């Protein structure tokens, strides 16, 4: 029995909790995303993520984008870990009362 999640929502939630990138398609592009938070907006599920690569190319600059989960085709976990981006602001108003799961900074010993 596989321990990997199946379906878009469980896959994205696992990626956020484990801080692992996902491969997916978005607007016909093949993307590698580092999802930081899943939340609801107007009754729809969104993830905010950093694009690590688009169609095999590195982005010119780091950007935190919002992606409607229904628009992400076949998200799959990769073994690639990511660091929490400085662009992610967990206290941002758009996440207030709507966050379902978010990355957590590692505890400092």
Label each PLM-derived region with a short phrase.
Residues 2-109:
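Core beta-strand-centered patch of the WYL/Sm-like small regulatory domain
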């Amino acid at each position: 029995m596989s321990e990997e999640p199946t379906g878009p929502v469980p896959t994205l939630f696992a990626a956020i909790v484990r801080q692992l990138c996902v491969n997916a398609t978005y607007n016909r592009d093949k993307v590698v995303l580092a999802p930081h938070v899943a939340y609801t907006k107007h009754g729809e599920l969104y993830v905010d993520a950093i694009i690590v690569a688009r169609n095999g190319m590195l982005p010119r600059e780091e950007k935190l984008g919002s992606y409607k989960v229904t628009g992400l085709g076949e998200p799959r976990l990769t073994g690639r870990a990511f660091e929490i981006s400085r662009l992610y602001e967990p206290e941002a108003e758009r996440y207030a009362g709507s966050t379902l799961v978010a990355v957590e900074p590692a505890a400092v010993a």
